[in-house]
Amino acid sequence: MYTSGYAHRSSSFSSAASKIARVSTENTTAGLISEVVYREDQPMMTQLLLLPLLQQLGQQSRWQLWLTPQQKLSREWVQASGLPLTKVMQISQLSPCHTVESMVRALRTGNYSVVIGWLADDLTEEEHAELVDAANEGNAMGFIMRPVSASSHATRQLSGLKIHSNLYH
């Protein structure tokens, strides 16, 4: 798994985790949009990184919205992952052309602690700015999940994971 250049525009994953830690004490957080690029043949790596964050967000009174392209979340997986089944909503078979628009609308409402959407193509500057504004307005987090195949991964970048944090620099 590696993150794209867009992921570093608003924040890194480690700062997202620190924001979540503050949610428990302050009960407020600013909006965040982050892209997660992962290998399709290694979904466990993504789960290891995101599940603790999603479990923490599940303690809020707000919903978690999953905008999935084809697959449907299984109840068994949601429960086994420690996510609150009663707070997870899913819209599946959403056309990619509607994913960004749906994410913006959902983030803006403030009804969701996190909105997760799958996109195959890079965001435009305008789409990214619109998502950031919506996340800030709704005080929510948005994750753009971008799967890549193992063959395209080998041609794009050799390192598997890059997490930039000002804590280590």
Curated annotation (Swiss-Prot):
Gene Ontology biological process terms, A to Z: division septum assembly; DNA damage response; DNA repair; negative regulation of cell division; negative regulation of cytokinesis; negative regulation of FtsZ-dependent cytokinesis; negative regulation of protein polymerization; SOS response
Outcome after substituting H128A: No effect on degradation by Lon protease
Gene: sulA
Function text: Component of the SOS system and an inhibitor of cell division. Accumulation of SulA causes rapid cessation of cell division and the appearance of long, non-septate filaments. In the presence of GTP, binds a polymerization-competent form of FtsZ in a 1:1 ratio, thus inhibiting FtsZ polymerization and therefore preventing it from participating in the assembly of the Z ring. This mechanism prevents the premature segregation of damaged DNA to daughter cells during cell division. The effect of overexpression of SulA is neutralized by antitoxin CbeA (yeeU).
Effect of H169A: Great decrease in degradation by Lon protease
InterPro entries: Cell_div_suppressor_SulA, P-loop_NTPase, SulA_CellDiv_inhibitor, SulA_enterobact
Domain of life (superkingdom): Bacteria
Essential for degradation by Lon protease, annotated site positions: H169
Keyword Disulfide bond: no
Outcome recorded upon mutating K87A: Loss of degradation by Lon protease
Subunit structure: Interacts with FtsZ.
Effect of R62A: Loss of degradation by Lon protease
This protein's name: Cell division inhibitor SulA
Record region (FtsZ binding): 106-112
